[in-house]
Amino acid sequence: MKIAVIYFGGQYNHLIVKDLKYLGLNAVLITPEKPVEILKDYDCIIFGGGPYSVITELNKMGNAVDYVLRTSQPKLGICLGHQLLAKVLGGEVTKATKPEYGLVKVNINDEDTILRGLSPSINAWESHTDEVISPPQGFRILANSENAKVQAMVNKDNTIFGVQFHPEVKHTEKGIEVFKNFIEACKK
Protein backbone atom coordinates (compact mmCIF):
# COMPACT_ATOMS: atom_id res chain seq x y z
CA MET A 1 0.00 0.00 0.00
CA LYS A 2 1.31 3.44 -0.98
CA ILE A 3 0.43 6.41 1.24
CA ALA A 4 0.97 10.10 0.51
CA VAL A 5 1.75 12.17 3.61
CA ILE A 6 1.16 15.83 2.80
CA TYR A 7 3.92 17.86 4.42
CA PHE A 8 2.95 21.36 5.58
CA GLY A 9 6.21 21.90 7.45
CA GLY A 10 5.01 20.34 10.69
CA GLN A 11 7.67 19.16 13.11
CA TYR A 12 6.03 15.73 13.52
CA ASN A 13 5.34 14.82 9.88
CA HIS A 14 8.45 12.63 9.62
CA LEU A 15 7.09 10.62 12.56
CA ILE A 16 3.96 9.80 10.54
CA VAL A 17 6.16 8.34 7.79
CA LYS A 18 8.24 6.47 10.39
CA ASP A 19 5.10 4.89 11.94
CA LEU A 20 3.73 3.87 8.55
CA LYS A 21 7.05 2.33 7.50
CA TYR A 22 7.13 0.48 10.83
CA LEU A 23 3.77 -0.99 9.79
CA GLY A 24 5.36 -2.16 6.52
CA LEU A 25 3.82 0.49 4.29
CA ASN A 26 5.29 2.66 1.56
CA ALA A 27 4.86 6.22 2.87
CA VAL A 28 6.14 9.30 1.06
CA LEU A 29 6.25 12.94 2.18
CA ILE A 30 4.79 15.22 -0.50
CA THR A 31 4.86 19.01 -0.39
CA PRO A 32 1.59 20.74 -1.31
CA GLU A 33 3.23 22.61 -4.18
CA LYS A 34 3.12 19.42 -6.27
CA PRO A 35 0.25 19.15 -8.79
CA VAL A 36 -2.81 17.23 -7.59
CA GLU A 37 -2.28 14.64 -10.35
CA ILE A 38 0.74 13.24 -8.48
CA LEU A 39 -1.66 11.77 -5.89
CA LYS A 40 -3.38 9.43 -8.36
CA ASP A 41 -0.73 6.76 -7.70
CA TYR A 42 -1.43 6.62 -3.94
CA ASP A 43 -3.94 4.42 -2.10
CA CYS A 44 -4.63 6.89 0.73
CA ILE A 45 -3.69 10.40 1.79
CA ILE A 46 -2.68 11.71 5.21
CA PHE A 47 -2.64 15.47 5.78
CA GLY A 48 -0.09 16.23 8.49
CA GLY A 49 0.22 19.11 10.89
CA GLY A 50 1.99 22.39 10.34
CA PRO A 51 2.38 26.01 11.40
CA TYR A 52 -0.41 27.46 9.25
CA SER A 53 -3.94 28.52 10.10
CA VAL A 54 -6.70 27.43 7.72
CA ILE A 55 -8.62 30.48 8.93
CA THR A 56 -6.20 33.01 7.44
CA GLU A 57 -3.48 31.13 5.53
CA LEU A 58 -5.10 28.65 3.13
CA ASN A 59 -3.41 30.60 0.33
CA LYS A 60 -0.01 29.62 1.78
CA MET A 61 -0.82 25.90 1.67
CA GLY A 62 -0.17 25.26 -2.02
CA ASN A 63 -2.62 22.88 -3.65
CA ALA A 64 -4.06 21.63 -0.35
CA VAL A 65 -7.64 22.56 -1.23
CA ASP A 66 -7.38 20.68 -4.55
CA TYR A 67 -5.85 17.71 -2.71
CA VAL A 68 -9.01 17.55 -0.60
CA LEU A 69 -11.60 18.27 -3.29
CA ARG A 70 -10.12 16.59 -6.37
CA THR A 71 -9.02 13.23 -4.97
CA SER A 72 -11.16 10.22 -4.10
CA GLN A 73 -8.82 8.19 -1.88
CA PRO A 74 -9.51 7.73 1.84
CA LYS A 75 -8.09 10.63 3.83
CA LEU A 76 -6.86 11.23 7.37
CA GLY A 77 -6.20 14.73 8.66
CA ILE A 78 -3.99 15.24 11.71
CA CYS A 79 -4.06 18.56 13.62
CA LEU A 80 -3.77 21.17 10.82
CA GLY A 81 -4.84 18.42 8.39
CA HIS A 82 -7.97 17.80 10.51
CA GLN A 83 -8.76 21.52 10.42
CA LEU A 84 -8.09 21.64 6.66
CA LEU A 85 -10.54 18.82 5.93
CA ALA A 86 -13.19 20.44 8.13
CA LYS A 87 -12.79 23.91 6.59
CA VAL A 88 -12.62 22.84 2.94
CA LEU A 89 -15.57 20.44 3.27
CA GLY A 90 -17.85 23.02 4.91
CA GLY A 91 -17.20 22.76 8.65
CA GLU A 92 -16.24 25.62 10.93
CA VAL A 93 -12.75 26.31 12.28
CA THR A 94 -11.98 29.13 14.74
CA LYS A 95 -9.22 30.27 17.05
CA ALA A 96 -9.34 27.99 20.08
CA THR A 97 -10.82 29.53 23.20
CA LYS A 98 -8.23 27.51 25.14
CA PRO A 99 -5.34 26.27 22.95
CA GLU A 100 -4.12 22.78 23.84
CA TYR A 101 -0.45 21.87 24.27
CA GLY A 102 1.07 18.73 25.70
CA LEU A 103 -0.86 15.73 26.98
CA VAL A 104 -4.65 16.10 26.93
CA LYS A 105 -7.32 13.58 27.93
CA VAL A 106 -9.34 12.75 24.81
CA ASN A 107 -12.74 11.17 25.45
CA ILE A 108 -13.77 8.60 22.85
CA ASN A 109 -17.52 9.00 22.32
CA ASP A 110 -17.89 6.77 19.27
CA GLU A 111 -15.37 3.96 18.83
CA ASP A 112 -15.69 4.09 15.07
CA THR A 113 -13.23 2.67 12.57
CA ILE A 114 -10.42 5.15 13.23
CA LEU A 115 -10.66 4.96 17.04
CA ARG A 116 -11.27 1.23 17.42
CA GLY A 117 -9.54 -0.06 20.56
CA LEU A 118 -9.03 3.34 22.16
CA SER A 119 -12.13 3.84 24.35
CA PRO A 120 -13.11 5.11 26.81
CA SER A 121 -10.28 7.71 26.66
CA ILE A 122 -6.62 8.24 25.85
CA ASN A 123 -3.98 10.76 26.81
CA ALA A 124 -2.95 12.34 23.53
CA TRP A 125 -0.34 14.88 22.44
CA GLU A 126 -1.82 18.21 21.34
CA SER A 127 -0.30 21.32 19.82
CA HIS A 128 -2.92 23.67 18.37
CA THR A 129 -4.29 27.20 18.60
CA ASP A 130 -7.14 26.69 16.09
CA GLU A 131 -9.92 24.13 16.44
CA VAL A 132 -12.83 22.61 14.58
CA ILE A 133 -16.02 23.74 16.33
CA SER A 134 -18.45 22.27 13.82
CA PRO A 135 -17.70 19.35 11.48
CA PRO A 136 -18.84 19.38 7.85
CA GLN A 137 -22.39 18.28 7.07
CA GLY A 138 -22.62 14.48 7.04
CA PHE A 139 -19.73 14.07 9.49
CA ARG A 140 -20.09 12.92 13.06
CA ILE A 141 -17.97 13.71 16.09
CA LEU A 142 -16.08 10.71 17.47
CA ALA A 143 -14.12 12.27 20.33
CA ASN A 144 -13.78 15.43 22.40
CA SER A 145 -11.64 16.91 25.16
CA GLU A 146 -12.36 19.39 27.92
CA ASN A 147 -11.44 22.30 25.64
CA ALA A 148 -12.12 20.97 22.13
CA LYS A 149 -15.52 19.69 21.06
CA VAL A 150 -14.23 17.98 17.88
CA GLN A 151 -11.13 15.92 18.68
CA ALA A 152 -12.03 13.38 15.99
CA MET A 153 -14.58 13.18 13.18
CA VAL A 154 -15.59 10.93 10.29
CA ASN A 155 -17.79 11.27 7.24
CA LYS A 156 -20.82 9.02 6.73
CA ASP A 157 -18.93 6.80 4.25
CA ASN A 158 -16.05 6.14 6.68
CA THR A 159 -13.55 7.42 4.10
CA ILE A 160 -12.57 10.83 5.51
CA PHE A 161 -11.25 11.06 9.06
CA GLY A 162 -9.82 13.87 11.15
CA VAL A 163 -8.06 13.88 14.51
CA GLN A 164 -6.99 17.03 16.33
CA PHE A 165 -4.40 15.16 18.39
CA HIS A 166 -1.08 13.76 17.15
CA PRO A 167 -1.16 9.93 16.99
CA GLU A 168 2.40 9.96 15.61
CA VAL A 169 3.92 11.45 18.77
CA LYS A 170 5.11 8.73 21.17
CA HIS A 171 3.40 10.40 24.15
CA THR A 172 -0.02 9.63 22.63
CA GLU A 173 -1.40 6.42 24.10
CA LYS A 174 -2.12 3.81 21.43
CA GLY A 175 -1.31 6.30 18.67
CA ILE A 176 -0.14 3.55 16.33
CA GLU A 177 -3.65 2.05 16.54
CA VAL A 178 -5.05 5.13 14.79
CA PHE A 179 -2.78 4.41 11.82
CA LYS A 180 -3.60 0.69 11.85
CA ASN A 181 -7.31 1.51 11.88
CA PHE A 182 -6.90 4.03 9.06
CA ILE A 183 -5.05 1.46 6.94
CA GLU A 184 -7.92 -1.00 7.48
CA ALA A 185 -10.36 1.69 6.31
CA CYS A 186 -8.19 2.29 3.23
CA LYS A 187 -8.48 -1.40 2.28
CA LYS A 188 -12.29 -1.29 2.11
Curated annotation (Swiss-Prot):
This is GMP synthase [glutamine-hydrolyzing] subunit A. The gene is guaAA. Catalyzes the synthesis of GMP from XMP. One of its GO terms (molecular function) is ATP binding. It comes from the Archaea. Keywords: ATP-binding, Glutamine amidotransferase, GMP biosynthesis, Ligase, Nucleotide-binding, Purine biosynthesis. It is an enzyme of class 6 (ligase). The keyword Ligase applies. Gene3D superfamilies: 3.40.50.880. The active site is at 79 (nucleophile), 166, 168. Its EC number is 6.3.5.2. GO terms for cellular component: cytosol. Residues 2-188 form the Glutamine amidotransferase type-1 domain. Signal peptide: none annotated. SUPFAM superfamilies: Class I glutamine amidotransferase-like. Pathway: Purine metabolism; GMP biosynthesis; GMP from XMP (L-Gln route): step 1/1. Heterodimer composed of a glutamine amidotransferase subunit (A) and a GMP-binding subunit (B). It holds the Pfam family GATase. The lineage of its organism: Archaea, Thermoproteota, Thermoprotei, Sulfolobales, Sulfolobaceae. The keyword ATP-binding applies. It catalyses: XMP + L-glutamine + ATP + H2O = GMP + L-glutamate + AMP + diphosphate + 2 H(+). It comes from Sulfurisphaera tokodaii (strain DSM 16993 / JCM 10545 / NBRC 100140 / 7) (Sulfolobus tokodaii).
